[in-house]
């Protein structure tokens, strides 16, 4: 006899998919999403690698006459010598120079030192550099050096009788004459002396002033050099005295400057001139390159880099002449020094062109890396004026673009701040464009190079992190808005976003920028037939709408969003119909092929539609849109799974999501039988992904009585029962959902006994129950519907199945046993949620029903007579 509770259970309606009007738990929402609504994945559009390194690739929208050249010649004559002069208030006369060491003091200018032979020892040179620094300090403290005369050809040390402070007594330090009073102050601060051969000696004041020489006539300025004038107090100074102090200060500044110049002359003649002499006479390229490296180090040590060095013009002329040698390695060495000397204008352009020309050959990447040319190029971008050097920046960025495609440079570029530098330039271009109200000349060409470089860099996780930290994505959107007429720029940024939105954090960042949706729609409308750009924009939209319901809503609310997608769908559906050869029956199909261009757009587009359909406010509208549904069905009709697997699967997934909505004006519901006919092709294919999508659609459609009749008439139910043996959880889940809907109709419950359906359901419960409580719940609901009119458990399910069900259900309803899996805490919570809300209620009801209609008495043996 049934208990009151059991009688209530007996009157329950058959288990069915939850009603839309019912308030759903979170578990039900997850369950429904698994049943009916799901996002669609796809691959990022394929970008072929360019065979040649050029400013603009073969797919560029720029015509040859409307873009800067990638091929050109750079010679010594290309450079301007006028730029070689140092920046100063005085215009300097050109210097004639031959990189040959002077033979004697008579052959050089009167202010130059003769350089000693042999060349100075490197250890001594380092000491010279230290002495130069001390000399600067002396000058700043008032021990100013007057002009000097030519020095003796051999280094000498002044040693004679003790110093006596007289009018004409002087001391020579580092080849420069000083009065004794100044020299004493110098020695107190700096006990080291630099002799002419670059050596230092420890000396005392007494040694220093033994045998003071006479000041040459041209150094004498009158007055007692050994006496100091008492300094008047500030309170007693007269205006005349103040003017005298100012003049004295100006004179001191001039003397300090002269001192620096003379110290530079010492370094120039002892270090630089011998190297230039070697450059002139050396014929071996490797030795010339080594000498260039030596020259760069010497210039750096002597603080002679930059654009203010007096001898810069002589140096640059020598370097320019060596460009004609034509060696790539030598040219890179020269370019690095020239850039370090801060050339400008045409010379900056030519040196950037020179490096660009070398970088076009991939085999030179190792040379560029070994010489750290990247650092010099980034310094150009960081320090030079963008508007004044746009063309130079163009070729500089061209080189950086080339090497950014080499993974070996990725770490170096990240470490040297390449991402930040590029985004700073892009922001500057945006601001200049906004300020002027129009795109500046050549800015588009430059943006192509910068965005192509960023496209290569975003493969690095560090680059993506930096872009997010500096809020770079809105800046890139602004570039697209301002240069929407430049297809090359827009395509590069679309490629950047294609990569970035494949990562969740970047996808969220772009989705939160509300202006991006209208921008992407404008791009689709403007470049509707430009497949390489459109396919990426649609791919980006698919990423944005994949897991973000707010993005789905925001995009759908943009003016013309659905009509734009419809127009694009229609355009590429027509293109696909008329493109390429259709495979005939006798044709041998390749095992795998890349989708055609039109197919690829359709793949990405159907994915966007499938994702949008998940939103409850958008899905019903699309399901009621006759043109969109018509194109989906036409695609499914014209394509087989062998023609284009991804397109067929995505189209079926979109139909599945749309079939979830039971609205009056749904085109899906109106044409459900036609859709069921189309799905039969997928069910009999050998593609398990295609079969799974078809079964999912049948899971939604089979809630309709007409579809249930169709399933039985076409023997689709037998196929569903067979799929229970697939040992694939998702396939078993979807097939069980169809069988559950069939058992709602009392007339169709007996079909579960065909093909061993009951046993297979019990096997699914045993195999997948402990790891998939949603699937276990579906199995129990199906068996509950099937056993509504049960009188005996053994006759209803069969003896073996009934006993197995009793054992399984009793075990699975024991919480300790059921949830004792080796899962992490999050997964345990997930399993417990579904076990408590979905499995336990129906499993307990089914167990009670079986117990109440099951006898545990064993049959007696038949007596023998």
Swiss-Prot record:
Ranges annotated as biased composition (Polar residues): 60-75
Chain segments carrying region Disordered: 39-75, 214-243
InterPro entries reported for this sequence: ARM-like, ARM-type_fold, Armadillo, ARMC2
SMART domains from the UniProt entry: ARM
Disulfide bonding pattern of the chain: none
Biological process terms in GO annotation: cell morphogenesis; cilium organization; nucleus organization; sperm axoneme assembly
UniProt repeat feature ARM, residue ranges: 261-300, 303-343, 362-402, 407-448, 461-502, 505-546, 550-587, 589-614, 617-660, 662-703, 705-744, 746-788
Keywords: Differentiation, Repeat, Spermatogenesis
Gene3D superfamilies registered for this protein in UniProt: Leucine-rich Repeat Variant
Task performed by this protein: Required for sperm flagellum axoneme organization and function. Involved in axonemal central pair complex assembly and/or stability.
Designated name of the protein: Armadillo repeat-containing protein 2
Source organism (scientific name): Bos taurus
């Amino acid at each position: 006899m049934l208990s009151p509770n059991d009688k209530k259970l007996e009157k329950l309606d058959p288990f069915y998919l939850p009603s839309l009007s019912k308030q759903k738990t979170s578990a039900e929402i997850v369950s429904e999403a698994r049943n009916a609504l799901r996002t669609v994945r796809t691959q990022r559009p394929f970008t072929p690698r360019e065979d040649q390194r050029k400013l603009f690739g073969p797919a560029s929208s720029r015509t040859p006459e409307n873009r800067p050249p990638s091929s050109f010649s750079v010679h010594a004559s290309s450079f301007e010598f006028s730029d070689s002069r140092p920046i100063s208030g005085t215009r300097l006369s050109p210097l004639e120079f031959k990189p040959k060491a002077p033979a004697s003091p008579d052959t050089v200018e009167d202010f130059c030192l003769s350089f000693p032979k042999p060349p100075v020892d490197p250890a001594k040179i380092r000491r010279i550099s230290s002495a130069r620094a001390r000399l600067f300090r002396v000058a700043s403290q008032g021990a100013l050096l007057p002009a000097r005369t030519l020095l003796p050809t051999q280094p000498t040390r002044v040693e004679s009788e003790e110093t006596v402070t007289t009018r004409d007594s002087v001391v020579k330090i580092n080849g420069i004459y000083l009065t004794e009073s100044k020299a004493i102050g110098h020695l107190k601060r700096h006990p080291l002396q630099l002799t002419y051969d670059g050596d230092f000696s420890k000396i005392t004041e007494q040694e220093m002033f033994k045998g003071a020489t006479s000041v040459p006539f041209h150094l004498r300025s009158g007055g007692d050099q050994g006496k100091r004038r008492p300094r008047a107090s500030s309170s007693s100074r007269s205006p005349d005295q103040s003017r005298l102090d100012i003049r004295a200060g100006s004179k001191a500044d001039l003397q300090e400057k002269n001192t620096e110049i003379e110290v530079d002359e010492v370094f120039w003649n002892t270090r630089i001139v011998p190297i230039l002499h070697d450059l002139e006479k050396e014929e071996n390229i490797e030795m010339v390159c080594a000498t260039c490296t030596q020259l760069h180090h010497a210039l750096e040590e002597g603080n002679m880099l930059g654009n203010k060095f007096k001898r810069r013009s002589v140096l640059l002329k020598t370097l320019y002449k060596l460009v004609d040698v034509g060696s790539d390695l030598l040219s890179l060495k020269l370019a690095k020094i020239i850039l370090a000397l801060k050339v400008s204008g045409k010379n900056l352009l030519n040196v950037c062109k020179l490096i660009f020309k070398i970088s076009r050959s991939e085999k030179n990447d190792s040379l560029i890396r070994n010489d750290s040319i990247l650092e010099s190029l980034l310094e150009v971008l960081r320090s030079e004026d963008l508007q004044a050097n746009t063309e130079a920046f163009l070729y500089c960025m061209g080189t950086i673009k080339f090497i950014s495609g080499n993974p070996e440079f990725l770490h170096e570029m990240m470490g040297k701040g390449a991402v930040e530098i590029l985004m700073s330039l892009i922001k500057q271009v945006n601001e200049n464009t906004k300020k002027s109200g129009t795109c500046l000349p050549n800015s588009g060409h430059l943006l192509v190079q910068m965005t192509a470089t960023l496209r290569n860099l975003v493969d690095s996780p560090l680059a993506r992190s930096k872009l997010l930290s500096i809020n770079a994505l809105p800046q890139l959107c602004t570039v697209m808005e301002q240069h929407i007429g430049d297809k090359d720029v827009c395509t590069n940024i679309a490629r950047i976003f294609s990569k970035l939105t494949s990562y969740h954090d970047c996808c969220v960042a772009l989705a939160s920028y509300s202006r991006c949706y209208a921008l992407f729609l404008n791009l689709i409308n403007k470049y509707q037939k430009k497949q390489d750009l459109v396919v990426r924009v649609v791919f980006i939209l698919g990423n944005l709408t994949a897991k973000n319901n707010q993005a789905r809503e925001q995009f759908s609310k943009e003016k013309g969003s659905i009509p734009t997608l419809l127009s694009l769908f229609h355009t590429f559906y027509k293109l696909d119909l008329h493109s390429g050869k259709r495979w005939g029956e006798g044709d041998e199909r390749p095992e795998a092929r890349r989708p055609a261009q039109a197919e690829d757009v359709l793949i990405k587009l159907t994915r966007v539609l499938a994702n949008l359909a998940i939103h409850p406010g958008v899905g019903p509208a699309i399901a009621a849109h006759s043109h969109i549904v018509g194109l989906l069905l036409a695609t499914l009709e014209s394509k087989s799974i062998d023609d284009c697997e991804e397109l067929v699967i995505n189209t079926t997934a979109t139909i599945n999501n749309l079939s979830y909505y039971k609205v009056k004006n749904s085109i899906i519901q109106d044409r459900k039988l036609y859709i069921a006919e189309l799905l039969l092709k997928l069910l009999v294919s050998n593609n398990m992904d295609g079969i799974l999508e078809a079964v999912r659609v049948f899971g939604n459609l089979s809630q309709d009585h007409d579809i249930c009749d169709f399933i039985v008439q076409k023997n689709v139910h037998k196929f569903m029962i067979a799929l229970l043996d697939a040992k694939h959880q998702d396939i078993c889940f979807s097939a069980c959902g169809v069988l559950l809907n069939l058992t709602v109709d009392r007339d169709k419950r007996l079909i579960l006994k065909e093909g061993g359906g009951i046993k297979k359901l019990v096997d699914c419960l045993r195999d997948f129950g402990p790891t998939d409580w949603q699937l276990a719940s579906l199995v129990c609901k199906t068996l509950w519907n099937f056993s509504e009119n049960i009188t005996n458990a053994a006759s209803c399910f069969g003896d073996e199945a009934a006993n197995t069900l009793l054992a399984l259900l009793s075990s699975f309803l024991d919480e300790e046993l059921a949830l004792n899996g080796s899962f992490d805490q999050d997964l345990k919570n997930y399993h417990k949620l579904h076990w408590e809300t979905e499995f336990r209620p129906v499993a307990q009801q089914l167990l009670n029903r079986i117990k109440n209609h099951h006898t545990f008495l064993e049959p007696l043996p038949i007596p023998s007579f």
